[in-house]
């Protein structure tokens, strides 16, 4: 039993009429299809045993047809909505019987056959409205012309249709196990483990199956078709063609779509525009959805999730031969809350050392005296930049990235409490010093210029000395220079390890100290000082460090500089 493949014949008919006589009934039936716009407007034909994809414009029905030529034929029709719910119905019209013509085999005249079909309204066999993957199955269907009509009243949408007259042997969709649920077997703050029972299509029928897991924060999906439509909703090539952009109105009329002004307004048809402007108009934001195809494993751990967040999980069994899929019953779960951290209390005017793990977070609290006009936060980030947020009684006052030394002064409020949130670097662990005070005094950390690099003068380099310069500020500070011999293969990794700006001169050997001096300049543009480091060995590499000392004894280190003396002089 076959579904009639009319779409091939429709294209070949004009050529065949000239060179070869088609069977009489088929030829007349095809001609009737072409002329009968009431029945076959924008029509398509469903092939037997193949899944087809289609696109619906909102409120514009689409019809598919197939012929069952013998009675008592098994029949299965499956419709898969993608982007939006569908309304669809399946109707049957009996085919006109061929007259014997006194044994001549001549059929009834074409007009009589056509009139019989047109006069028959057909019998509705099944109808459905929703976004589920829905089936029509019959073990014994009568012969006749079957019409599948689909419409989307919500929005333009994709869909899939599959029909077969041999449902027992085809089975292109994987079969679900007796318990088709997806179970959550393990739950953490950033990970969730899922498990499900294998499909009999793999374990019993030995067909190649792979499982695809889909994770998102919105809802469960009922088909891979719906997942893929959501994932690529912002791709221009997936958008429905629009008159004036992809087709002109004549093309649309040719394909069976109305092209009058009212229809254009309903679908927001636009005049001809440039491709770049068109892409800006139709581009949608990307959806937060992930899809993993994991082979034939039926256990999967999802990682890198956010704490205290609800996620929806779906599993699809995919036939590797037909690429057709079946959805398990999805589930949802909320990750555990972030472990509540102990909040450190800051004492007024005292420097506190803070260590933060990679990508970690620390919370500090500051409760100044009840009556205060201003609050000052001084932060010294020892390694990479860190993020700081300050809230006063829940209201966000400050959100900044801090590298080096920064000072923030905020307006106070009687009896206010301040919560400080510190977020570490993605590169590695973070270290910092922080001071909070409601008193007006000198900050604990010395002021720094914007550029904390040390410059070496190559032309002034000798076999036993190196001349360097660095910037200062308008504030009088004490600067100390230290030197350390390093190997020629001293790498950036070693340099990074030595770049902790919070380690002061007290961690250095006395033999490494070169000198200390005071320096400042009222003219910020002339705040430059130079120094010649002597007593070096020929052809050797040295790491030079400059420390600037604060009023409270806290120091800040400039960026280290590697210099190499001349080997021959």
From Swiss-Prot:
It is found in: Secreted. Glycans are attached at residue 323. GO terms for cellular component: extracellular matrix; extracellular region. GO terms for biological process: cellular response to fibroblast growth factor stimulus; extracellular matrix organization; gonadotrophin-releasing hormone neuronal migration to the hypothalamus; negative regulation of neuron apoptotic process; neuron migration; positive regulation of cell-substrate adhesion; positive regulation of neuron projection development. This is Protein NDNF. InterPro entries: FN3_dom (IPR003961), FN3_sf (IPR036116), Ig-like_fold (IPR013783), NDNF (IPR019326), NDNF_C (IPR045805), NDNF_Fn(III)_1 (IPR055271), NDNF_N (IPR056225). Disulfide bonds: none annotated. Its main location: secreted. Keywords: Glycoprotein, Neurogenesis, Repeat, Secreted, Signal. Secretory protein that plays a role in various cellular processes. Acts as a chemorepellent acting on gonadotropin-releasing hormone (GnRH) expressing neurons regulating their migration to the hypothalamus. Also promotes neuron migration, growth and survival as well as neurite outgrowth and is involved in the development of the olfactory system. May also act through the regulation of growth factors activity and downstream signaling. Also regulates extracellular matrix assembly and cell adhesiveness. The gene is ndnf. PANTHER family: NEURON-DERIVED NEUROTROPHIC FACTOR, PROTEIN NDNF. GO terms for molecular function: glycosaminoglycan binding; heparin binding. Residues 261-332, 446-565 form the Fibronectin type-III domain. It comes from the Eukaryota. Residues 1-19 form the signal peptide.
